[in-house]
Amino acid sequence: TVMVDNRVDRLPFTPNVHQFNSDNTQVNWNGLLGRLELIARPALWLDDVRIFPDVAHRSFRVEITPGRLTGDRSKGMVTVLATSFNHGGKPHRPPPVSAPVLAHDKSSVITLVLPLGDEAKLWDEFSPALYRIAVTLESPAGRDDREIEAGLREFKPHGTQFTINGRTTFLRGKHEAGVFPLTGHPPMDVNGW
């Protein structure tokens, strides 16, 4: 059973910060949309994986939070491997990095630095080279895998403008508040998005 409870007194936000409770764009977006699935995981699994690009050092910092069900210390080995793709050249595969995992409390975080070397492919809108970063956690309880796509880029302000990897860029977008689809829910297919 799944219960969706959108009562305002149960949501942690200030008044009128979203269309959910704005007089101008209030809608009833209750329910669950999109793909729902239940996945079996080992007793020690990859609860969260976060990727942080570091252009200056040509590397990714990978923060891994293991999840566990038991109260005892859980042991395993985590491995991170990156492979570039979508850039038209030979895939770049730097050597993988590994570290032991000893999950002893809910705040255990393993931080690994994955050096990419001088052949690292940078990402920007004109050269959108990406890496598939495969994270594997192996333990006596089983194996859990996660794959994340990430680009090696540095986004920062420069005077009154922004740069990506030192190149001036312009951010484009649009605001679509108060848009009500005829179906009563957002599109659920690729073409609609």
Spans of features found by a protein language model:
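Secreted/periplasmic carbohydrate-active enzymes, especially glycoside hydrolases
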Residues: 1-193
